[in-house]
Regions:
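Pan-zinc metallopeptidase signature
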Residues: 20, 33, 196-316
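Proteolytic processing junctions in secreted/extracellular precursors
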Residues: 2-13, 17, 26, 30, ...
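Active-site scaffold of zinc-dependent metalloenzymes
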Residues: 82-136, 146-150
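Active-site metal-coordination segments of metallo-dependent hydrolases
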Residues: 180-195
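Extended, charge-biased low-complexity segments
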Residues: 67, 72-74, 78, 84
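Histidine-centered divalent metal-coordination motifs
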Residues: 141, 145
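Post-HEXXH active-site segment of zinc metalloproteases
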Residues: 133, 149-183
Length: 316
């Protein structure tokens, strides 16, 4: 809980820096990149996927008991283009099967391919109950990337900086090179916008359907976990800045971009503060859009959060 409180304190401090509630709301759209059209399309796609899941035949994994899956494909018109949505829906008999087998089951990656206009994702459920907030968060996160790419008319991965980041992240997860790439990745503007768009989708769904305390949605969100990871990995990098393998990576980055270690860390630290600020303002926007009071500092947090069956999603 301490880590969450520290982050929430940072969020609160940047949220109230001389700004009234109305001041914050006025500049939210341009600063956060929260696009109402992306939110609308995300909700529609969630509903279409939920309908499609109901119609797909149940399949079973070989040698993995207590789990079934459905593979589906839908098409959808978004931002003037037809996109394809491929999904894998995995249902576990109960949490014990999820805990035991989830890491070993083949899953659809969560991504958007700009060249083929294809969104891919995995949807997980336990006893038929979908983790609705991860579902909403994932779709809006990836659709925000698509929206960003339609504005520049090419894939984000085409940029030189992004290529370097992805090359670093292709190394073993515990390596310093991976961690360097990861903190650079999390603090790019396009990723920060996508992360906070995902949080916005989860919050709005909650406020309209479940009214779970904001603390709990944030605590379970990918953006919160990204911010935690960013802070841990940055600290490890700073404590190992003389490491030989890390310096080989830094030399290669400097040769390709002319940017040194101090520049990268400065950029990361600015991005870290910006991400905390974006989270705070996304919460304000979601609560304003749903006409609810600010519950961010409610102390009576619950330890579990709502999951929905496919039927409940279809009726939402």
């Amino acid at each position: 809980m301490g880590g969450l409180n520290n982050i929430l304190n940072d969020i609160n401090s940047v949220l109230i820096e001389g700004k009234t509630h109305n001041d914050v709301c006025k500049i939210i759209t341009e600063e956060l990149g929260i696009n109402d059209k992306v939110a609308e399309v995300s909700l529609d796609i969630m509903k279409e996927i939920s309908k499609d899941i109901s119609m797909q035949p149940k399949q079973y994994f070989t040698n993995i008991p207590g789990a079934s899956f459905k593979d589906g494909l839908i098409t959808y018109q978004a931002f003037g283009k037809k996109i394809t949505v491929k999904y894998r829906y995995i249902n576990y008999r109960d949490k014990s099967y999820f805990d035991k087998y989830d890491a070993n089951i083949r899953q659809m990656p969560n991504d958007f391919n700009y060249a083929t206009k294809t969104l891919r994702l995995t949807i997980k459920s336990i006893s038929g109950n979908i983790d609705i907030y991860t579902f909403a968060d994932t779709i809006q996160h990836e659709l925000e990337h698509y929206f960003q790419e339609t504005k520049i008319n090419h894939s984000l991965a085409d940029s030189n900086w992004y290529k370097i980041v992805l090359k670093c992240k292709n190394r073993p997860r515990q390596s310093l090179t991976y961690m360097l790439g990861d903190i650079m990745y999390i603090t790019t503007k396009c990723e920060e916008e996508a992360f906070t768009n995902g949080l916005y989708a989860a919050l709005v769904y909650n406020y309209k359907n479940d009214n779970i305390p904001t603390y709990e949605i944030l605590d379970n969100s990918p953006v919160y976990n990204a911010l935690l990871t960013l802070r841990k990995e940055k600290e490890i990098i700073l404590n190992n800045k003389d490491d030989i393998s890390l310096n080989k990576t830094l030399s290669a980055i400097k040769k390709a971009t002319s940017k040194n270690f101090d520049y990268i860390i400065s950029k990361v630290e600015k991005g870290e503060k910006e991400l905390a600020r974006r989270i705070g303002r996304v919460i304000v926007k979601a609560q304003k859009d749903c006409n609810i009071p600010n519950d961010m500092w409610i102390n009576n947090r619950r330890n579990t959060y709502t999951k929905k069956t496919v039927e409940e999603l279809n009726n939402a």
